[in-house]
Amino acid sequence: GDIGTHAHNLTRFITGLEVDEVAAEVGAIVPKRIIHDFGGAMLRFENGARGSFWVTQAAAGVENCLRIRVSGTKGSLEWMQEFPQALTFKPLNAPSQNRTPNGPGTLPLSARCTRLVAGHPEGFPDGFANIYSDAAEAIAARRAGKQADPLALYFPNSFDGLMGVRFV
Protein backbone atom coordinates (compact mmCIF):
# COMPACT_ATOMS: atom_id res chain seq x y z
CA GLY A 1 0.00 0.00 0.00
CA ASP A 2 0.88 3.64 -0.06
CA ILE A 3 0.31 4.50 3.59
CA GLY A 4 2.93 6.98 4.70
CA THR A 5 4.23 7.83 1.22
CA HIS A 6 2.21 11.05 1.06
CA ALA A 7 3.45 12.14 4.50
CA HIS A 8 7.01 11.36 3.44
CA ASN A 9 6.67 13.38 0.24
CA LEU A 10 5.11 16.32 2.08
CA THR A 11 7.86 16.21 4.72
CA ARG A 12 10.55 16.38 2.03
CA PHE A 13 8.78 19.25 0.24
CA ILE A 14 8.23 21.35 3.37
CA THR A 15 11.65 20.87 4.93
CA GLY A 16 13.76 20.55 1.79
CA LEU A 17 15.54 17.67 3.54
CA GLU A 18 16.06 14.05 2.59
CA VAL A 19 15.38 11.26 5.07
CA ASP A 20 18.50 9.21 5.88
CA GLU A 21 17.11 6.73 8.42
CA VAL A 22 13.66 5.37 9.28
CA ALA A 23 12.37 3.24 12.14
CA ALA A 24 8.76 2.36 11.35
CA GLU A 25 5.87 0.07 12.05
CA VAL A 26 2.95 -0.55 9.71
CA GLY A 27 0.01 -2.85 10.04
CA ALA A 28 -3.72 -3.32 9.89
CA ILE A 29 -5.89 -2.10 12.75
CA VAL A 30 -9.22 -3.11 11.21
CA PRO A 31 -9.75 -6.87 11.70
CA LYS A 32 -9.41 -8.97 8.52
CA ARG A 33 -8.17 -5.98 6.50
CA ILE A 34 -5.42 -7.21 4.18
CA ILE A 35 -3.81 -3.81 3.52
CA HIS A 36 -1.98 -1.58 5.96
CA ASP A 37 -4.22 1.04 7.53
CA PHE A 38 -1.80 2.33 10.15
CA GLY A 39 1.82 3.42 10.17
CA GLY A 40 4.16 5.23 12.48
CA ALA A 41 7.70 6.37 11.70
CA MET A 42 10.63 8.02 13.43
CA LEU A 43 12.89 9.81 10.97
CA ARG A 44 16.46 11.06 10.92
CA PHE A 45 17.17 13.65 8.24
CA GLU A 46 20.38 14.25 6.31
CA ASN A 47 21.29 17.23 8.53
CA GLY A 48 20.73 15.29 11.78
CA ALA A 49 17.27 16.72 12.47
CA ARG A 50 14.67 14.31 13.83
CA GLY A 51 11.06 13.88 12.84
CA SER A 52 8.11 11.59 13.27
CA PHE A 53 4.71 10.95 11.81
CA TRP A 54 1.83 8.60 12.18
CA VAL A 55 -0.79 7.90 9.58
CA THR A 56 -4.00 5.91 9.70
CA GLN A 57 -7.06 5.10 7.66
CA ALA A 58 -8.75 3.57 10.69
CA ALA A 59 -9.48 6.51 13.02
CA ALA A 60 -13.23 6.36 13.60
CA GLY A 61 -14.97 9.67 12.98
CA VAL A 62 -11.85 11.44 11.71
CA GLU A 63 -12.06 13.18 8.36
CA ASN A 64 -8.58 13.14 6.80
CA CYS A 65 -6.98 14.96 9.73
CA LEU A 66 -3.80 16.20 8.06
CA ARG A 67 -1.76 18.23 10.52
CA ILE A 68 1.83 19.37 10.07
CA ARG A 69 4.19 20.80 12.66
CA VAL A 70 7.80 21.73 11.94
CA SER A 71 9.95 22.88 14.85
CA GLY A 72 13.38 24.46 14.74
CA THR A 73 15.71 26.50 16.92
CA LYS A 74 13.82 29.77 16.33
CA GLY A 75 10.26 28.47 16.65
CA SER A 76 7.61 26.23 15.12
CA LEU A 77 5.15 26.32 12.24
CA GLU A 78 1.83 24.49 12.36
CA TRP A 79 -0.82 23.92 9.68
CA MET A 80 -4.04 21.87 9.78
CA GLN A 81 -5.99 20.83 6.70
CA GLU A 82 -9.27 21.39 8.54
CA PHE A 83 -8.31 25.08 8.86
CA PRO A 84 -6.34 25.59 5.65
CA GLN A 85 -6.44 29.39 5.73
CA ALA A 86 -4.20 29.62 8.80
CA LEU A 87 -0.52 28.95 9.24
CA THR A 88 0.54 29.42 12.86
CA PHE A 89 4.06 30.62 13.58
CA LYS A 90 5.15 30.10 17.16
CA PRO A 91 8.44 31.95 17.65
CA LEU A 92 10.63 31.10 20.62
CA ASN A 93 9.87 33.42 23.57
CA ALA A 94 7.24 35.42 21.67
CA PRO A 95 3.47 35.26 21.10
CA SER A 96 2.06 33.00 18.39
CA GLN A 97 1.28 34.60 15.06
CA ASN A 98 -1.39 33.48 12.61
CA ARG A 99 -0.50 33.95 8.96
CA THR A 100 -3.22 34.01 6.31
CA PRO A 101 -3.05 33.74 2.51
CA ASN A 102 -1.98 37.04 0.94
CA GLY A 103 -1.85 38.61 4.39
CA PRO A 104 1.13 40.48 5.82
CA GLY A 105 4.36 38.50 5.57
CA THR A 106 3.23 36.31 2.66
CA LEU A 107 6.25 34.96 0.80
CA PRO A 108 6.40 35.22 -3.02
CA LEU A 109 5.89 31.47 -3.64
CA SER A 110 2.80 31.46 -1.42
CA ALA A 111 1.44 34.63 -3.03
CA ARG A 112 1.88 33.05 -6.46
CA CYS A 113 -0.34 30.12 -5.41
CA THR A 114 -3.04 32.24 -3.77
CA ARG A 115 -5.83 33.31 -6.10
CA LEU A 116 -7.76 35.69 -3.88
CA VAL A 117 -7.21 38.77 -1.78
CA ALA A 118 -6.51 38.41 1.92
CA GLY A 119 -9.60 37.53 3.93
CA HIS A 120 -11.31 35.37 1.30
CA PRO A 121 -10.99 31.60 1.68
CA GLU A 122 -9.62 29.67 -1.29
CA GLY A 123 -13.04 28.04 -1.77
CA PHE A 124 -14.79 31.42 -2.09
CA PRO A 125 -15.32 31.16 -5.90
CA ASP A 126 -16.90 27.73 -5.42
CA GLY A 127 -19.87 29.40 -3.73
CA PHE A 128 -20.51 31.45 -6.86
CA ALA A 129 -20.02 28.39 -9.05
CA ASN A 130 -22.74 26.63 -7.04
CA ILE A 131 -25.11 29.58 -7.51
CA TYR A 132 -24.51 29.65 -11.29
CA SER A 133 -24.86 25.89 -11.57
CA ASP A 134 -28.16 25.87 -9.66
CA ALA A 135 -29.52 28.81 -11.67
CA ALA A 136 -28.60 27.05 -14.93
CA GLU A 137 -30.29 23.86 -13.72
CA ALA A 138 -33.48 25.78 -12.85
CA ILE A 139 -33.50 27.55 -16.23
CA ALA A 140 -32.92 24.30 -18.14
CA ALA A 141 -35.68 22.54 -16.19
CA ARG A 142 -38.14 25.37 -16.87
CA ARG A 143 -37.31 25.38 -20.61
CA ALA A 144 -37.87 21.61 -20.70
CA GLY A 145 -41.20 21.98 -18.89
CA LYS A 146 -39.91 20.09 -15.86
CA GLN A 147 -39.52 20.82 -12.17
CA ALA A 148 -36.02 21.63 -10.99
CA ASP A 149 -34.56 19.81 -8.02
CA PRO A 150 -35.93 21.74 -5.01
CA LEU A 151 -32.41 21.82 -3.54
CA ALA A 152 -31.24 23.75 -6.62
CA LEU A 153 -33.59 26.67 -5.95
CA TYR A 154 -31.65 28.41 -3.17
CA PHE A 155 -30.05 31.13 -5.28
CA PRO A 156 -30.80 34.86 -5.47
CA ASN A 157 -33.70 35.79 -7.74
CA SER A 158 -35.08 39.05 -9.15
CA PHE A 159 -36.91 39.81 -5.90
CA ASP A 160 -33.62 39.53 -4.00
CA GLY A 161 -32.10 41.94 -6.53
CA LEU A 162 -34.98 44.38 -6.01
CA MET A 163 -34.52 44.22 -2.25
CA GLY A 164 -30.81 44.96 -2.69
CA VAL A 165 -31.56 48.01 -4.84
CA ARG A 166 -34.15 49.24 -2.34
CA PHE A 167 -31.65 48.82 0.47
CA VAL A 168 -29.09 50.99 -1.32
Predicted feature descriptions by range:
Residues 1-50, 54-63, 159-162:
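Rossmann-like dinucleotide-binding domain that binds NAD(P)(H)
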Residues 13, 21, 40, 45, ...:
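C-terminal glycine/acidic-rich active-site capping loop/insertion
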Residues 164-167:
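Alpha-helical scaffold segments in carbohydrate-active enzymes
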